[in-house]
């Protein structure tokens, strides 16, 4: 996947979340531990979102790329973020957003993916 395709998917999901009433806190939050594509909140929920973008489903569903190792890395980065920001009184969840950009755009958003 090209960087520009991934960036396009992240922009699409950012807009999708805003339409659903979320506010984006961070995009491409990076530490030495890894990266989280989008951090957004709505009410007392903070969602750490991994975005997977593909041109087709020829090689399987995009969410299949979020394996156990990737999940562990996301947990570590999120824990770092929570501690750094001193976040309390929030519920946290990990979501996966799939974007297929083919003849038509398809979005599949999975709340509490892991």
Curated annotation (Swiss-Prot):
Signal peptide: none annotated. It holds the Pfam family UPF0102. It comes from the Bacteria. GO terms for molecular function: nucleic acid binding. Belongs to the UPF0102 family. This is UPF0102 protein Amet_2739. It comes from Alkaliphilus metalliredigens (strain QYMF).
